[in-house]
Amino acid sequence: MKKMLALACSLGLAASLMTGCNSKTEDVAASTAASAATEAAKTETPAAGSGTMIALITMDSIDQHWVTLNEGAQKAAGELGVTVQFMAPNTKDDAQQIECVNNAVSAGAKAIIVAANGPDAISSALKEAQSSGVKIVYVDSPANVDAEATFSTDNKAAGKTAGEEMLKALSAAGVTSGSIGVINVNAATDSCVMREEGFRSAFEGKGFTLLERQYGEGDAAKSQSIAENYITQGVVGIFGCNEGSTTGAGNAIKASGKDGIIGVGFDKSDAILGLIDDGYLLCTMAQNPDVMGAKGVEACVKALEGDSLGGAVSDTGVSVLKK
């Protein structure tokens, strides 16, 4: 499996860009991103097509989930003749993500595809972007502002599936009671909140105790520390709500040397697949970020061409990946 490449390029569209919001430009239009931004500021461009820049703003630039989402967006951009500028904070940070939105508007983005880290925090910036005529499309995690369309996993249903998979494994091992640890990202990210809600619903009336969730901010090292603490409490299972928390949980189970702790999580990465192959994680709920990225670009182009998408919410699906 190929190793993940962290994206840490700086945005070169405007001299006024501040630090904290990373970006990666991939030329899909004939001109460079810099000249496209300059021309966008000076002249009118077609609703969609050559010279049209769409900003893709994810929660961070590190998780393989976002890298794959960007790959899907870039492929669609090439097919549709637009430019997608990938912009993301170095880490999951509301202030940096807001900065990315403001930078995108200043750079002349006609549309913004966004995965909101904090739905409330980013909403004002998105409203200001809309007031400037920028089209908004959500992928993975929406904010609290009406958008052209949303493409995401049915996170509550997928979370319940994760819980059901853990229950089946516990039952097969003859475990009918015990404590379950839950590692989430934060209290605001809607997608992860829904995953936890769905996961907990699977255990209702099943005789297990789900411990109070702990927040690892999507960071694998922090999540591993949380998982290690859960393990010292004697948990029989640990659920990770995203890539970082799942990786951390698997690494903690591996480091503990203990058998019988069932680890279940979300997202697909080389690290997670390796932990599954080695038996430290039972399974992961693999989303389809490439589909989210591609559909997001397609929706932006349609909206810029005047089509009404009606704020439709589309489920991009999930698969259970096991050994």
Description of each model-found segment:
Residues 2-7, 21-323:
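A residue-level marker of the well-folded mature domains of exported/periplasmic proteins
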Residues 11-12:
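Repetitive helical segments and hydrophobic/amphipathic motifs
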Residues 16-20:
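C-terminal motif of bacterial Sec signal peptides marking the signal peptidase cleavage site
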